[in-house]
């Protein structure tokens, strides 16, 4: 796995030697960032269920101002730190080793993010709750992206408006904006 574009293009990212982590494929990550390109420069990004950190590192490489990585697995959080170090990234990020829902609850609404990227385990029980919590931290013109199994259709909280689905193999990227912003927004 490598950083696809930007300042750290071509840098190798370590992948886990243990089961249970499903890193976003290079192809799907490239598709995602081609869509997000106009939103990345200077953005405040939250990478939830960060795993290897590949998605957040890609955002940093492409000019995000700050990335908050949230990952509850200690080995994965250490892997994120290692990947950041291997890429030579010395700042512009925070790694939080915590359960994503609890970490979202602990953040203040003033802590708004321009992009929230969530890649929960496909068998997670309550995507609705996580989407609801994340929506409270989304900037008024922000975008929330959920990577999910194509076969699993998420229930969507009323404060979010679904604007796009991008399918790739067994995975789908579902994109949301705040429902109150949906009338005046340009969609990704």
For every predicted segment, state its role.
Residues 1-188:
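Class I S-adenosyl-L-methionine-dependent methyltransferase catalytic core
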